[in-house]
Amino acid sequence: MSFADYGFAIWETFYVTVLSTAFSLVLGLPLGVLLVAGDKDGVLPLPGWLMHILNIVINILRSVPFLILMICVFPLTRAIVGTTVGTKATIVPLVVAAFPFVARLVETSLRELDEGVVEAAQSMGATPFQIITKVMIPECLPGLISSMTTALTTIIGYSAMSGVIGGGGLGKIALSYGYYRYQTNIMIVCVVLLVLMVQVFQTVGTFWATRSDKRLRK
């Protein structure tokens, strides 16, 4: 294994992680907001049966182990990217596994918001959309950034497991060389590189979460 091989594997892991997180955010953020706003006491109450179905679907997707989920979504992966093997193919199961997790993280962050802030906005005649976009999300931004950082670091771990289906990245190298060929030194290097990636993402995420916290800027 050369430095170029490790560098390309790091790039593949970074590419898959960032894209999967972005797609998970696109799906998970609105869903997480809906779980809070759609409550019977929320700013945009939805039918109880619909909220019940959403919660069940999220819980089911979150409860399936990632390796099994990858196999279960093979038909969906093939329909979207045309193959079930390779770096791009791993993005689909990663998104399916991560967006329910993101939705729960968003829900948790939004539920920590003081109800008085929302009530004040309602008393001033703000619409549900205005309350969500100009009150709930901005007020909970530090928590949301922290949640996205958690999701990002979790997806790094998932991406390593995707090496089982030839997903590329550090996971594939660790599996192909470290496990199948018993080259423990290569596996250790891959683990160290994954740990460093997690540390970098976590540090950057924590910095921006702190930077966006209005309470700490006073």
Locate each region found by the language model.
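Short helix-to-coil transition segments within interhelical loops
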Residues: 110-140, 167, 180
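Transmembrane alpha-helices
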Residues: 18, 128-159
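Periplasmic/extracellular loop-to-transmembrane helix junction in inner-membrane transport proteins
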Residues: 1-20, 47-55
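Cytoplasmic-entry segments and transmembrane alpha-helices of multi-pass inner-membrane transporters
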Residues: 34-72, 94, 99, 104-108
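Loop-to-helix entry region at the N-terminal start of transmembrane alpha-helices
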Residues: 8, 12-16, 59-62, 66-99, ...
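Transmembrane alpha-helix signature in integral membrane proteins
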Residues: 7-38, 148
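Glycine-rich helix-loop "coupling/hinge" segments at transmembrane-helix boundaries
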Residues: 158-188, 192-193, 213, 218
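C-terminal transmembrane helix and the adjacent membrane-cytosol boundary/short C-terminal tail
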Residues: 34-41, 187-218
